[in-house]
């Protein structure tokens, strides 16, 4: 009796991919539907393929090419291991009260937030370079270090005080919109409640003799985005960027690499034929 190999380490309870400006409506729709698909796939892999004692909280991700500490399959921290020091005391202090925004010339382009501080990662951009950093790590070019990492910000310790660095802080400060109002509304809704993604998209694992055949995609109660993305009822998702979502190891690798992807190719089976849905964040698709 065939069985899928369980993931060796905890994976994502939820995965929320936040795309920056998508000028064309097709890119907007495909980007949002991909957000929903990846979030739902992450929840399903966590439910069906992980050990019973796995525990993980919300994750927030933006497509970014992180440098240093490369990801390896089976390692949830993706880019390396955080220091062993217990920062629980300083974490409580850093998260209480209002914290001023940092004036450092850096931006936060991605976050992987875990209930275990040692597993959380911040992707920080400075001078056109991007770096992955854990709690306790130093900020490139500054005598500052990361104190806490949460779903939408990191808290830094710089010159004896705490400062906050938020996702899209630079865009919010200049008043520039990061995406359309509709995208922000759905993104915020999913970030607050990951399972609300089911209002737009439902995903069900399809098995045959206990072997996973793929993930069946269907519209939720708000089906407009589903159909505008070119999806059809009962499409069967089988791979992402060439990695087989039906294989536990490859599915884990696909989820782990999402933070560094700028091009996405979701393959679905439809009426016995494979169809590709393609999105390039840096192109005109």
Curated annotation (Swiss-Prot):
Grouped into one coarse class, the protein's main location is membrane
Top-rank lineage group of the source organism:
Bacteria
- Give the record's family classification: Belongs to the GSP C family.
Q: What is this protein called in UniProt?
A: Type II secretion system protein C
Q: Which InterPro entries match?
A: PDZ_sf, T2SS_GspC_N, T2SS_protein-GspC
Cytoplasmic side residue ranges read: 1-27
Q: Name one GO cellular component term.
A: type II protein secretion system complex
Its biological purpose? Involved in a type II secretion system (T2SS, formerly general secretion pathway, GSP) for the export of proteins. Required for the translocation of the multiple pectic enzymes.
The answer on whether this UniProt entry bears the keyword Calcium reads no
Localization, UniProt? Cell inner membrane
Q: Which stretches of this protein does UniProt put in the Periplasmic compartment?
A: 49-285
For this chain's UniProt record, which GO biological process terms are given? Answer: protein secretion by the type II secretion system
What is the scientific name of the source organism?
Pectobacterium carotovorum subsp. carotovorum
Alphabetical UniProt keywords? Cell inner membrane, Cell membrane, Membrane, Protein transport, Transmembrane, Transmembrane helix, Transport
Q: Where is the chain membrane-spanning?
A: 28-48
